[in-house]
């Protein structure tokens, strides 16, 4: 999935 908790999206 694509969420703010997944991947380095700071």
From Swiss-Prot:
Source taxon at top rank: Eukaryota
Other facts: On the 2D-gel the determined pI of this unknown protein is: 5.71, its MW is: 12.4 kDa.
Name recorded for this polypeptide: Unknown protein from spot 2D-000JYC of 2D-PAGE
Organism, as annotated: Saccharomyces cerevisiae (Baker's yeast)
């Amino acid at each position: 999935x694509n969420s703010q908790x997944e991947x380095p999206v700071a």
